């Protein structure tokens, strides 16, 4: 994960980093979506500057929020082979988590998660993640009642992260 001191950020060539203002540690100070908007990386303030919050760290926070908001529920987390090993081998306590490791790419995350079935009134308790900021989340199907789709949506990832932090 990339980190910068406040001074380093002020001298960066990247416009976002140059313009980030000092903030309390843990404050989200920026976010970046990729070109087609399906990935999200977040910039948070630290004690000495800033850090990038990658997909694995986003997934970790989402799981902690799930444990707090719906303890003892069953979740399925799929992560690509590039993800942090700790994410799959030592998931958050308070949840029953089935983990799966997949090839790189949101396609393979979706293939693995679809095995759970995507039918029901309640949102399926599953998501997939790549360290690159690609988080595959369930979304209600726009035309089929009680059916769910899987989407990689950077804006939805950002909103999910912000809600999990609150």
Residue ranges of model-derived segments:
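Phosphate-binding chemistry for phosphorylated carbohydrates and sugar-nucleotides
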Residues: 1-165
